[in-house]
């Protein structure tokens, strides 16, 4: 399963044996984990959005500059590569698509809480539109 979450829940994500993968342009200095910058916002429009806080502007630019330039199959393969070779072999030997395998657990993480505007929600929507189940990991 592919989840979305945020850095404040990193410890709990790891305790659930879910592989965290940052999808932000710049991670916290203390974060030493996996990063996938191909799903991060472009610095220029991100800084412009920080000034104007226009979510429609952000959505338009993120879609056009990031998501429209990504292939879902390549993104899934890149995420799959965060698993160890042994894990990959185990997952591949099942007879279902690997992103549906119960052992394929990744959390795409960034900074914002679930209720806040965040590009990870746009990434999740894009994946869902491409037939990949994604949900926000709710941890109390």
Labelled PLM ranges:
Residues 1-140:
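Residues lining hydrophobic/aromatic ligand-binding pockets adjacent to catalytic sites
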């Amino acid at each position: 399963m592919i989840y979305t979450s945020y850095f404040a829940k990193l410890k709990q994500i790891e305790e659930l044996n879910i592989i965290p993968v940052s999808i932000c342009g710049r991670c916290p200095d203390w974060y030493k984990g996996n990063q996938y910058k191909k799903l991060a916002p472009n610095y220029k429009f991100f800084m412009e959005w920080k000034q104007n806080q226009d979510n429609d502007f952000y959505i338009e630019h993120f879609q056009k500059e990031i998501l429209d330039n990504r292939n879902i199959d390549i993104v899934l393969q890149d995420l799959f590569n965060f698993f160890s070779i042994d894990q990959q072999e185990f997952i591949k030997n099942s007879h279902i698509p690997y992103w549906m395998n119960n052992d394929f657990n990744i959390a795409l993480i960034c900074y914002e809480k679930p209720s806040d505007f965040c590009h990870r929600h746009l990434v999740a929507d894009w994946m869902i539109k491409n037939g990949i189940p994604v949900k926000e990991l709710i941890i109390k």
